[in-house]
């Protein structure tokens, strides 16, 4: 990847990637409990998987404002007051970082993931009206989620560590919800790859808690004051 644009520095881009992982984790929790999640936040979390020719972080996350949930989640996870309320989200986030490490140890699995992702187009926002075109687009979305979920099961699920998702049994057993959860986990691992490329390391999550929390807040302010 080439140097990123000048809007943010490397440390900030590293935390944007971390926010993308946390957003995937937050949406996994939401889906597991409610069976639904906002479409724009889902797309912002998943499409980085499908950006194969990217030269900058903002090529991977073209609408950084759609990562606002992840940035807010990072602020809460690293807050002494609110961190305890986000135990599942923190666990999913750390789990995706661990799975990145295990994926990095298998070149064959990396090649399989890369080859299969190359045949899948990025998701587009669908106006969920009742007309026939919207129905067809939503069916296409469902097929994409199924493809990505199958890829997760064929690869990441074979690794020695597995993320145990907590939620309502009826949602976890729902095929469409389960497909979206697996897709989000795969999307989070992709962002974990970028986080690592930008210098992210798990030990820094312990020693730089306050700085990470402050950076996430600063990025959110930059995004919404420059919009």
Question: Whereabouts are the PLM-identified features?
Answer:
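Short, mixed-charge aromatic SLiMs
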Residues: 45-55, 119-128, 207-223
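A structural signal for well-ordered alpha-helices, especially hydrophobic packing surfaces
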Residues: 22-25, 29-32, 100-107, 121-124, ...
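Short, solvent-exposed segments of well-ordered alpha helices
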Residues: 5-19, 58, 79-83, 87-90, ...
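Leu/Val/Ala/Ile-rich N-terminal alpha-helices, chiefly Sec-type signal peptides and the beginnings
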Residues: 1-77
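Long amphipathic alpha-helical segments with strong coiled-coil/leucine-zipper propensity
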Residues: 50-138
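Conserved binding-pocket/active-site segment within a compact domain
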Residues: 125-200
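Alpha-helical oligomerization segments
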Residues: 180-227
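Structured alpha-helical bundle/scaffold domains in large eukaryotic membrane-trafficking regulators
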Residues: 33-40, 167, 200-207
């Amino acid at each position: 990847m080439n140097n990123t644009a000048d809007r943010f520095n490397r440390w900030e881009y590293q935390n944007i990637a971390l926010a993308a992982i946390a957003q995937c984790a937050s949406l996994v929790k939401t889906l597991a409990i409610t069976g639904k999640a906002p479409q724009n936040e889902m797309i912002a979390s998943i499409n980085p998987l499908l950006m194969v020719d990217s030269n900058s972080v903002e090529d991977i996350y073209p609408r950084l404002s759609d990562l606002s949930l992840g940035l807010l989640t990072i602020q809460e996870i690293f807050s002494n007051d609110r961190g305890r309320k986000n135990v599942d989200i923190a666990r999913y986030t750390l789990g995706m970082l661990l799975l990145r490490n295990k994926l990095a140890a298998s070149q064959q699995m990396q090649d399989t993931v890369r080859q299969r992702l190359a045949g899948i187009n990025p998701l587009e926002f669908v106006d969920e009206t009742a007309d026939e075109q919207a129905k067809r687009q939503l069916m296409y979305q469902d097929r994409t989620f199924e493809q990505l979920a199958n890829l997760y099961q064929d690869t990441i699920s074979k690794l020695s560590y597995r993320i145990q998702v907590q939620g309502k049994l009826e949602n976890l057993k729902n095929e469409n919800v389960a497909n979206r959860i697996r897709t989000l986990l795969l999307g989070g691992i992709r962002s974990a790859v970028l986080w690592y490329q930008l210098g992210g390391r798990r030990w820094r999550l312990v020693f730089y808690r306050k700085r990470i929390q402050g950076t996430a807040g600063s990025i959110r302010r930059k995004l919404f004051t420059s919009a």
